[in-house]
Amino acid sequence: MAQEKVFPMTAEGKQKLEQELEYLKTVKRKEVVERIKIARSFGDLSENSEYDSAKEEQAFVEGRVTTLENMIRNAKIIEDDGGSNVVGLGKTVTFVELPDGDEESYTIVGSAEADPFEGKISNDSPIAKSLLGKKVDEEVTVQTPGGEMLVKIVKIS
């Protein structure tokens, strides 16, 4: 039997996934079932776009429920080791781009909870891979979609 993938994440990340799962199971499923029921009342299902749309949404919701259940079941909570001198999962790292000094901060999280718009990047991302295990004042070459850039780590928290 194949071993299931482990999803490293913070406790906060797991809690957010559990909240999303609860919402999908208790609220969204009921909404979709109601939409299907209403669409069925329109009659002929062969050309009923409301019905097709509701069934597609139901498939998406059920797929997301399955995905979330798997991620939660196989979550590996990353505990903060208390030290903040090394870049690791769950840590926020601030660095400056050399030589111009543009400062950026990211929290490194498991892929299941990554959200670049919230400043959370996956530990599997090229930037995180370059930074993991490094310390304050280290200069690191980071791979980005735009090419390589040299950064200096200024803070880890």
Swiss-Prot record:
Induction: By heat shock, salt stress, oxidative stress, glucose limitation and oxygen limitation.
Keyword Calcium: no
Keywords: Coiled coil, DNA-binding, Stress response, Transcription, Transcription regulation
Pfam families tied to this protein: GreA_GreB, GreA_GreB_N
SUPFAM superfamilies registered for this protein in UniProt: FKBP-like (SSF54534), GreA transcript cleavage protein, N-terminal domain (SSF46557)
Coiled-coil segments: 50-70
InterPro entries reported for this sequence: GreA/GreB_C_sf, TF_GreA/GreB_CS, Tscrpt_elong_fac_GreA, Tscrpt_elong_fac_GreA/B, Tscrpt_elong_fac_GreA/B_C, Tscrpt_elong_fac_GreA/B_fam, Tscrpt_elong_fac_GreA/B_N, Tscrpt_elong_fac_GreA/B_N_sf
Domain of life: Bacteria
Recorded GO MF terms: DNA binding; RNA polymerase binding
Gene Ontology BP annotations: DNA-templated transcription elongation; regulation of DNA-templated transcription elongation
Family of this protein: Belongs to the GreA/GreB family.
Function: Necessary for efficient RNA polymerase transcription elongation past template-encoded arresting sites. The arresting sites in DNA have the property of trapping a certain fraction of elongating RNA polymerases that pass through, resulting in locked ternary complexes. Cleavage of the nascent transcript by cleavage factors such as GreA or GreB allows the resumption of elongation from the new 3'terminus. GreA releases sequences of 2 to 3 nucleotides.
Name of the molecule in the record: Transcription elongation factor GreA
Organism encoding this protein: Bacillus subtilis (strain 168)
Gene of this entry: greA
